[in-house]
């Protein structure tokens, strides 16, 4: 009986004993390459979850817009790529929340233009990574709050990866970059003061989750169980402290999902 259950539990994972994840490994500090190996918060998080299930984890480097199609095409068991939980995404996949975050605005330190929120972006060139969840919100804002009120639209430039957006900012192809708060902090540190964060408050607060296929209850249940087990460990607490990140509370799940 037990053996049958064990083999059943492995049946829905691509490789027995392994959680295969799709990750866009260009997005420090969540997932990035370090000495030829995937590193970062999401990578360590999944390792901890896998270990608590007696499994190992593998991250398959995949560009962000290809993650959901890859998941649906069974190239991997889950997506593990700091993916924001949105109503749009929940129509096509299920998501398991594990982190709370939001966006910040970054500009060159010596720029006169230092917007604090999208209201100051009408008529300006803004750079962002393609496929991000807040893009629709920004486009809608440009239409409803800029154009409809007789102001020039926000010019939004999309780039394949986040570092390319920062490059565009440095070369003045865009005037500001909107990116995840943790990524923004990393960019400021890495560029040693060449860029600054100009927004105080978190824009578009969201939950981040692992993506799982809707028709795959085995993987979903295993991930939820692994996360629950891992969250009770010191290692989990230390992981959040190391990255200065915020774990998800039951309250967050209620309020942010409602919004």
Go through the PLM ranges and name each one.
Residues 6-37, 113-114, 119-125, 254-259:
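Immediate post-signal peptide segment of exported/extracytoplasmic ligand-binding proteins
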Residues 25, 100-107, 189-227, 245-259:
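Periplasmic-binding protein-like
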Residues 43-52, 111, 119-133, 209-248:
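Extended ligand-binding regions for polar small-molecule ligands
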Residues 47, 51, 56-120, 201-202:
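Acidic, polar ligand-binding/catalytic clefts
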Residues 47-54, 134-158, 188-192:
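Ligand-binding cleft/hinge of the Venus flytrap
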Residues 66, 82-91, 137-141, 170-204:
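A ligand-binding cleft/hinge motif common to bilobed small-molecule-binding domains
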């Amino acid at each position: 009986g037990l053996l049958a259950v064990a083999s059943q539990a492995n049946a829905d994972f691509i490789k027995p004993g392994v959680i295969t994840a799709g990750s866009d490994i260009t997005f420090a500090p969540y997932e990035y390459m370090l000495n030829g190996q995937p590193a970062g918060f999401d990578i360590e998080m999944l390792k901890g979850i896998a270990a608590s299930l007696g499994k190992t984890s593998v991250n398959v480097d995949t560009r962000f817009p290809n993650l959901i199609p890859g998941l649906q095409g069974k190239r991997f068991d889950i997506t593990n790529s700091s993916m924001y939980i949105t109503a749009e995404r929940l129509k096509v996949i299920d998501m398991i929340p594990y982190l709370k975050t939001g966006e910040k605005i970054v500009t060159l330190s010596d720029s006169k233009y230092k917007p604090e929120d999208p209201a100051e972006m009408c008529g300006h060139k803004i750079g962002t990574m393609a496929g991000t969840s807040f893009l629709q919100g920004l486009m809608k804002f440009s239409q409803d709050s800029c154009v409809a009120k007789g102001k020039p639209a926000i010019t939004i430039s999309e780039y394949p990866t986040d570092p390319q957006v920062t490059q565009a900012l440095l070369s003045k192809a865009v005037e500001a970059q909107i990116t995840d708060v943790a990524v923004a902090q990393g960019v400021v540190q890495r560029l040693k003061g060449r860029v600054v964060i100009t927004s105080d408050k978190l824009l578009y607060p969201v939950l981040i989750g692992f993506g799982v296929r809707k028709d795959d209850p085995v993987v979903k249940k295993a991930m939820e169980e692994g996360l629950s087990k891992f969250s009770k460990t010191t290692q989990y607490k230390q992981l959040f402290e190391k990255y200065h990140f915020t774990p998800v509370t039951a309250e967050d799940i209620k309020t942010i999902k409602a919004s």
